[in-house]
Each structure stands twice: as structure tokens, then as C-alpha cells.
Amino acid sequence: ATLPSTAMPVETTTQVPKGRDGFVQHLSGTAERVAQESGIPASFMLGQAGHETGWGKSEIKTANGGNSFNLFGIKAGKGWTGKVAEITTTEYINGTPRKVVAKFRAYDSYEDSFRDYAKLITDNPRYEKAQATAKTGSAVAYAAELQKAGYATDPEYAKKLSGAINSALRVQRAQA
């Protein structure tokens, strides 16, 4: 039986397993679908989602304790009209880690999160170089360009992200 086109695959709304291998396995189908449309390799998105959530251990929760489905730590800026989740997070201000309260985007599914991330990277001129490096397949170059463009405030972000991307890639290869 085929799903109606409006039905979401189950992995897009069920809680993601905690831990790298289960996390990657659970979200690979979603990442592959979005990669086909966006040109951003699935392993890059899985690695970034894994890094941002501690491989599913620390997902952003909504005020009522529900899942925000925000795998990428995307903030809800002035232009965001969707749902939000407000949490305390660590931001690096002048190189010093500080706890701040910030609003993050909230989604209806993990697929929505992947699609919004891909849209952010492909549509925002700030990430033009990152998008170009994604096509080369270099996790190190992609992570470096995201950091240069200001995706995160952590001064070690590129190093941590490229490690997470390569880790996701190893899991994907082992599961293939």
C-alpha cells in the first residue's frame, strides 16, 4: 500500500532515538529526501543535526514540554511567523560562553526542520559559500564556511561540526 501524498513518514514525527547510530538511522530517509531537493549532502545535515542535539540527547522542548522538532538550533528571528520554543542556551559573546534566553523555531515534524534548514542554507545569501562547498563534498570546508557566515557563536563550531559530519557519514556507510 502506498501512503497518500499528504501522509508524513513515521520517522518524521516519532521521537528520535538517543545516541549517534540510532539517530542517524532514524533520520536518514528524511535527510536523503531533502538532500535530493537541496543539494546539501544528507550526511552534512545529519551531522549538523546530531551535533546540535547531542545525537538526540538534548532536543529543544516547547513551553509545555513537547517536541519542537528543531534539530538545527535555528533561532526564530524577526521574520519568523511560525511557532517558537523559548529556552536558555549558551552563546559565545566576545569569546566568552554566556547563558541567554533565546527563541527558537518550532516545527510540526523533523522533515519540516530539515526542509527549513535546507531553505535557510540555499536561500540566504549569507550562506552562499557554504552552499557552494556542500557541492564539493568537503565536510571541513562546509563547516568552516558555516562558521565564517555566523551560523553559530562557538569559536570551535567548525571543528566540532566537521567531526560530527564525518561521524554521521561513517554510520551511514556502515548501515548501507
Where are the language model's segments positioned?
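Catalytic cores of secreted/periplasmic lytic hydrolases that degrade extracellular macromolecules
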Residues: 1-176
